[in-house]
Amino acid sequence: MERPEPELIRQSWRAVRRSPLEHGTVLFARLFDLEPDLLPLFQYNCRQFSSPEDCLSSPEFLDHIRKVMLVIDTAVTNVEDLSSLEEYLAGLGKKHRAVGVKLSSFSTVGESLLYMLEKCLGPAFTPAVRAAWSQLYGAVVQAMSRGWDGD
């Protein structure tokens, strides 16, 4: 896999980093639009959400959004040395597998990430920026997928 363009990723992430919860909410709203079957996977204290809006407004889910955005931020920070995150990301993959996430759903998460970036960046979301983020996300998912492979 080609290495992502670090400067394009860092520069575009600066805009997102200013309001990670807001942009993360856009990402997950899009995810639930594209793959509504994921909603039941998010249960906190045995509470099932009746709608994406119910989920997106819950304090527990907002905490999950913050954590996801922090993982993305960590990947951006380490974009030139993603191998340093491989063990952590494989563990994260294993946790997702344990709660019933299918590896195939990460394709939809990637689409949702690109959607969020496009909404946040507007005209600055160029084909080169899109390609750089696709490469970064692909590398992250590749590392996370090791959590599905091994025990």
From Swiss-Prot:
Query: What processing steps or modifications follow its translation?
Result: Phosphorylated during hypoxia by ERK1/ERK2. Phosphorylation regulates the heme pocket hexacoordination preventing the association of His-64 with the heme metal center. Thereby, promotes the access of dioxygen and nitrite to the heme and stimulates the nitrite reductase activity. Phosphorylation during hypoxia is stabilized by 14-3-3 proteins.
Q: Which UniProt keywords apply?
A: Cytoplasm, Disulfide bond, Heme, Iron, Metal-binding, Mitochondrion, Oxidoreductase
Q: What is its main location?
A: cytoplasm
Catalyses: Fe(III)-heme b-[protein] + nitric oxide + H2O = Fe(II)-heme b-[protein] + nitrite + 2 H(+)
Which subcellular locations apply to this protein? Cytoplasm, Cytosol; Mitochondrion matrix
Q: Which SUPFAM superfamilies match?
A: Globin-like
The residue ranges of the Globin domain are 1-149
Q: What is this protein called?
A: Neuroglobin
Annotated organism of origin: Canis lupus familiaris (Dog)
Q: Which gene encodes it?
A: NGB
